[in-house]
């Protein structure tokens, strides 16, 4: 971890610890246990200590961790929403999830949903980490993943394909699950599999045919690999513009999840279901504030105060 990131995490830990001491978590907990609110948050590649500590905290404090099927039944008003409902998911399909997440899932017997990016499963790496590792081969203006994310999808794919051709398949260590790994976690009674597209594109940069392919083909592959229906979708990068809805409907998805950090409720659009983003390298205190929808409102308030003071 670089110095800037270390400083950032230390400052955020201090702020989060202060918010906890000031009773923000306690008040939010009372609201979550009282109202028909669903606490929804997701990870990418957490270490085992962070994942276990968050799971244990919610289990020990009277929350109910619900499965994907229970979530859908609650949304469709087939069952009542329990007080303090929590739904947990993970994006991408990182191989380290097998060592850091799955043992905790089995130990605590908690349901989780994995949103899998199929291209990374088949090729071993996620495109943004390959771009970073091979940045010396890119033009200077495209050496940051954010610059590549701004490109039209066809152009981004061409660049990544060129990098694949210029680097041998075994040049980098595998970071994504294998097909057998996906089959294995899908066989666990606690796990549900969802789609995270094929290539993890920025969907608003895609043509209609590209969106159609990303949503349809990833679903088909995951269903072929697992032998189970894939009914939900996670927007890559949390980015969307509304054009995706027609393809979600076409391919039979019943839920699509975002990275909007707030509680979900029974009136939410099923294709814009919110989830708070857990920081893989952040502290427990900061991430508890993220999960319980404390962090974002406070940060927005600070930003408004700073803006008014200028």
Q: What is the predicted role of each segment?
A:
Residues 1-88, 95-96, 127, 133, ...:
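C-terminal active-site subregion of NodB/CE4 polysaccharide deacetylases
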Residues 94-95, 199:
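Short, glycine/acidic-enriched loop or turn micro-motifs at the edges of active sites
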Residues 98-111, 148-158, 162, 290-310:
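Electropositive, surface-exposed helix/loop patches at the edges of structured domains
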């Amino acid at each position: 971890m670089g110095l800037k990131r270390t400083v950032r995490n230390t400052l955020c830990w201090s702020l989060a610890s202060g918010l906890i001491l000031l009773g923000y978590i306690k008040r939010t907990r009372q609201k979550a246990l009282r109202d028909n609110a669903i606490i929804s948050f997701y990870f990418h590649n957490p270490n085992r200590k962070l994942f276990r500590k968050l799971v244990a905290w919610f289990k020990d404090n009277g929350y109910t961790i619900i499965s994907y099927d229970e979530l859908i039944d609650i949304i469709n008003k087939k069952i009542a929403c329990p007080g303090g409902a929590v739904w947990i998911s993970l994006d991408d399909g990182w191989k380290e999830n097998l060592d850091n997440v799955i043992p905790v899932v089995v130990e605590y017997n908690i349901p989780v949903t994995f949103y899998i990016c199929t291209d990374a499963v088949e090729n071993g790496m996620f495109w943004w980490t390959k771009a970073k590792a091979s940045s010396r081969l890119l033009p200077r203006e495209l050496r940051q993943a954010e610059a590549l994310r701004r490109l039209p999808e066809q152009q981004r794919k061409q660049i990544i394909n060129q990098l694949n051709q210029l680097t041998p398949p075994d040049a980098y260590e595998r970071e994504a699950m294998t097909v057998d790994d996906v089959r294995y976690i899908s066989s666990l009674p606690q796990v549900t599999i969802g789609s995270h597209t094929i290539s993890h594109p920025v969907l608003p940069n895609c043509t209609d045919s590209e969106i159609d392919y990303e949503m349809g083909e990833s679903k088909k592959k995951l269903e072929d690999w697992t032998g189970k229906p894939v009914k939900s979708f996670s927007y890559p990068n949390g980015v969307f513009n509304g054009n995706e809805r027609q393809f979600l409907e076409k391919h039979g998805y019943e839920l699509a999840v975002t990275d909007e950090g707030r509680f979900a409720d029974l009136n939410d659009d099923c294709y814009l279901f919110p989830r708070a983003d857990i920081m893989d390298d952040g502290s427990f205190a900061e991430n508890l504030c993220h999960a319980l929808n404390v962090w974002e409102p406070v940060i927005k308030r600070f930003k408004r105060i700073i803006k008014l003071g200028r």
